[in-house]
């Protein structure tokens, strides 16, 4: 009974659910004894040993499941840690790779600078100790690869150390001379004369003093004996010698050109005295026999045609080939050296000056000062550049050029490097062959095509067609006049990207409001502090231009509006500003031309065409060649020149006026050439005509567009003409050849009108157009 009750009591004391049966156990046993054996068997079955084992197994299984889940979570975290470590290692490898590339590019840039400096000036560029980039060995490599990389690092250190030794001893130039001599000797193309010259060169380089030669020989012998075993395994001496002579071998220059340039460089750096060959020289040269193997390797790496080039060069070196007095050549060399020393501080002419010179050269039949052909020093086309040609090239560099203000904005930006490195188009000038004149004309016209104007800014703030525009003379600022009764000022440096196009949008920084009708014309003063506008209300409003950096949301400034110039009774069609006299010209639909002072708001000083003999003026401009004259076009097809001082009409330009067709002879715009006495007119019949202001004769007439020509503008240098038309196109013309060099569509049509005005910036690389589609576009 006790043995059977023991497990039950133990179970009831330990099991949490048996607390209620702890005191009922004896009563149950008594009841079981009184009721029968069946009740006692049921009580014993509830606390049996299999039940305990089942409970333990259940708890153990639950513990194992939780442990498995913990291990899974730990494995996931370890995998995440490994992934992050791998990502970090990848970033470090990427950083190392980028650092290596940066070092490589820096080294390549230094080599490129040295190359261009050598080609341009003929001397080496001092950039300090220009060593190839050294990279640290990767830490993650296997142990088998580390000894090899360490040995390579030791090789590099050995090369650098030996290079320093050679520089200290002074063997740099010697190795160059001996190397070139060995190559010619191996190829079998050296003649007696060249051998003697080479021996003299080697004597002058090696035999500075007898003590130096002996000391050099002793140092060379000791180095060779100590490093014989190293030379058997490593051939870094070959690479070191190649680095001295072929630093730019990686570039697109063959060995022949490189050797010629190196030879000339050595000649310029060290004048070679006339010394004879002696025993010390031969002994010193014997120490460089180990370079024969390196020369054979270099010979294999050169192209197959180098042997012929060496032969040609050696033949060129012989004076018998040229029948030239050696004294004359020596004298020319000395003269060239003096000129080069005196011209080191002289800056090469820029692109605009070269263009001025080319424009002047086109009108000259012969150029006696340039009889020999001039080759560009930046792009050598032959294996040898004669000393005479080099001196002539320096004479061309010393020529004076006429001043130019801003012609560089016509040409492309990619010529900036070319203008700094060479003579540009002057490299192809030859006056010996007269048949080259046509090719020169074609090349000069081709240069004008290099600059392609592309749309840059789109000005979208006006609500109606834009009638006129004017650039600030200095700043990148534009003022537009529109039919929506307003003028707007734009700062082209304050841009914002457009939503659906590659061009940039510019918001106006100021809006001028005073006109009671459409604004038809606008002009700025020479200093950019005032602007004047005319409209259909017959008023000429005078404005003070605001600061280009003004906040568009600043409070209203009443001082901007200076006041109206009263006098016209109908629409003002055109304005022109005279910087020389500070006067303003205006033409109006009332048939008069008026001259105003700009220093104050006052009535007109002079009135022209009171009787309307020539018709109603449509356009007016100042004659640039004579500031006291003005030119105006009229509705009847006449163009006349007036003297503003005497108030008299002095000349009426030639015109074929047909009274029956008044619309076809209408002149929409007249402008004056900025440097020549020429007037240019734009006609309703699609023509552009050129007139001589002195004689009034028609110089040239051409059909320029498919529809009426509405606007004209000439660049500040007077080389290019820009025209706008109602056919939606803007065309750029070469004024010398009267040919179109570029055409682009700028605006859309509205009420059969398209482009109202075009303009060049006086000092910056901008052109602008105003259209009937309420847009103004700026091109660069």
Curated annotation (Swiss-Prot):
**Which superkingdom is the protein from?**
Eukaryota
Coiled-coil annotated residue ranges, if any:
53-120
Keyword Coiled coil set for record: yes
Basic and acidic residues biased stretches: 299-315
List residues modified as Phosphothreonine: 225
What does the record say about tissue specificity? Mainly expressed in the central nervous system. Mostly confined in dendrites, not in axons, and is most abundant in dendritic spines.
Q: Does Transit peptide count among this protein's keywords?
A: no
Q: Which GO terms describe its cellular component?
A: bicellular tight junction; cytoplasm; dendrite; dendritic spine; FAR/SIN/STRIPAK complex; glutamatergic synapse; neuronal cell body; postsynapse
> Repeats (WD): which ranges?
461-500, 514-553, 567-606, 662-701, 704-743, 750-780
Q: What segment(s) does the record annotate as region Caveolin-binding?
A: 55-63
State the UniProt keywords alphabetically: Calmodulin-binding, Cell projection, Coiled coil, Cytoplasm, Membrane, Phosphoprotein, Repeat, Synapse, WD repeat
Sites where Phosphoserine occurs are at 137, 227, 229, 245, 259
- The ranges of region (Calmodulin-binding) come to 149-166
A molecular function (GO) held by this record is: protein-containing complex binding
What's the main place this protein lives? Answer: cytoplasm
Basic residues bias (residue ranges)? 338-351
Q: What CDD domains does UniProt report for this protein, alphabetically?
A: WD40 (cd00200)
The region called Disordered is annotated at 124-145, 290-321, 334-353, 363-388
The family database entries (InterPro entries) matched by this protein are listed as:
G-protein_beta_WD-40_rep (IPR020472), Striatin_N (IPR013258), WD40/YVTN_repeat-like_dom_sf (IPR015943), WD40_repeat_CS (IPR019775), WD40_repeat_dom_sf (IPR036322), WD40_rpt (IPR001680), WD_repeat_striatin (IPR051488)
Q: Describe its membrane topology.
A: Peripheral membrane protein
Give the quaternary structure: Part of the core of STRIPAK complexes composed of PP2A catalytic and scaffolding subunits, the striatins (PP2A regulatory subunits), the striatin-associated proteins MOB4, STRIP1 and STRIP2, PDCD10 and members of the STE20 kinases, such as STK24 and STK26. Interacts with CTTNBP2; this interaction may regulate dendritic spine distribution of STRN. Activation of glutamate receptors weakens the interaction with CTTNBP2.
Q: What does this protein do?
A: Calmodulin-binding scaffolding protein which is the center of the striatin-interacting phosphatase and kinase (STRIPAK) complexes. STRIPAK complexes have critical roles in protein (de)phosphorylation and are regulators of multiple signaling pathways including Hippo, MAPK, nuclear receptor and cytoskeleton remodeling. Different types of STRIPAK complexes are involved in a variety of biological processes such as cell growth, differentiation, apoptosis, metabolism and immune regulation.
Family classification: Belongs to the WD repeat striatin family.
Protein name, entry field:
Striatin
